[in-house]
């Protein structure tokens, strides 16, 4: 099993992330940001990754630091669990619909952080959740997981549906990229010999 635990403590947040990449989608989520918990649940269930995330942050100011730092810590945990990347598929992609919304996510465990985020949300908030925080979550994730990530919402009228398709597709792409390929067991998935 590929397990990892990362703790991040700053003056703004205290976060603990435990993951099992070879899990069944079990989750225990307590970030203090209910909509973020809902989206993290999508990653766990659709990625079949067991997630245990606890966060305490300065949400009395706003949710920005908590959301961003959960992304950072999750990225660190994924990188730790993947390790040297031997035998993984490296690339993953997924299209996910939800009613009128459709999103595509493509990920590469290249070791080169990069984010292309193209989601034209139809409103600025989903309940109390500022949709701009989703890009902060993913930026924190890519910078600390060392991945290239392309996120495109291809269509959608309902911002909740747009966001949910993004997180579901992300979970599925993550699962595909981190799966072990028995035909490439013990090999680094790169012509360079390292990632």
Swiss-Prot record:
PROSITE patterns linked = IGP_DEHYDRATASE_1 (PS00954), IGP_DEHYDRATASE_2 (PS00955)
Query: A Pfam family matched by this chain, by name?
Result: IGPD
GO CC terms in record:
cytoplasm
Q: Reaction catalysed by this chain? A: D-erythro-1-(imidazol-4-yl)glycerol 3-phosphate = 3-(imidazol-4-yl)-2-oxopropyl phosphate + H2O
Q: Where are its TM segments located?
A: none
Q: Which UniProt keywords apply?
A: Amino-acid biosynthesis, Cytoplasm, Histidine biosynthesis, Lyase
Q: Which InterPro entries match?
A: IGPD_sf, ImidazoleglycerolP_deHydtase, ImidazoleglycerP_deHydtase_CS, Ribosomal_Su5_D2-typ_SF
* Signal peptide interval: none
The chain's disulfide connectivity reads none
Answer whether the UniProt record assigns the keyword Cytoplasm to this protein: yes
Q: What GO molecular functions are on record for this protein?
A: imidazoleglycerol-phosphate dehydratase activity
Compartments where found: Cytoplasm
Q: Which GO terms describe its biological process?
A: L-histidine biosynthetic process
Question: What is the E.C. number?
Answer: 4.2.1.19
| Metabolic or biological pathway | Amino-acid biosynthesis; L-histidine biosynthesis; L-histidine from 5-phospho-alpha-D-ribose 1-diphosphate: step 6/9
**HAMAP family named among the record's database cross-references:** HisB
Indicate the family of this protein: Belongs to the imidazoleglycerol-phosphate dehydratase family.
Q: What is this protein called?
A: Imidazoleglycerol-phosphate dehydratase
């Amino acid at each position: 099993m590929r397990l990892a635990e990362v703790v991040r403590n700053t003056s703004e947040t205290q976060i603990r992330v435990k993951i099992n990449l070879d899990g069944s989608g079990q989750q225990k989520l307590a970030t203090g940001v209910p909509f973020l918990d809902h989206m993290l649940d999508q990653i766990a269930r659709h990625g079949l990754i067991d997630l245990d995330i606890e966060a305490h942050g300065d949400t009395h100011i706003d949710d920005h630091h908590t959301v961003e730092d959960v992304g950072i810590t999750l990225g660190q945990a994924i990188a730790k669990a993947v390790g040297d990347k031997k035998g993984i598929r490296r690339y993953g992609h997924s299209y996910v619909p939800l009613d009128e919304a459709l999103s595509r996510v493509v990920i590469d465990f290249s070791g080169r952080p990069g984010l292309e985020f193209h989601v034209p949300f139809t409103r600025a908030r989903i309940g109390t959740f500022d949709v701009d925080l989703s890009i902060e979550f993913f930026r924190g994730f890519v910078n600390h997981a060392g991945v290239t990530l392309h996120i495109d919402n291809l269509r959608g009228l309902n911002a909740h549906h747009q966001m949910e398709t993004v997180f579901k597709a992300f979970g599925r792409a993550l699962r595909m990229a981190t799966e072990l390929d028995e035909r490439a067991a013990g090999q680094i998935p790169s012509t360079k010999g390292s990632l």
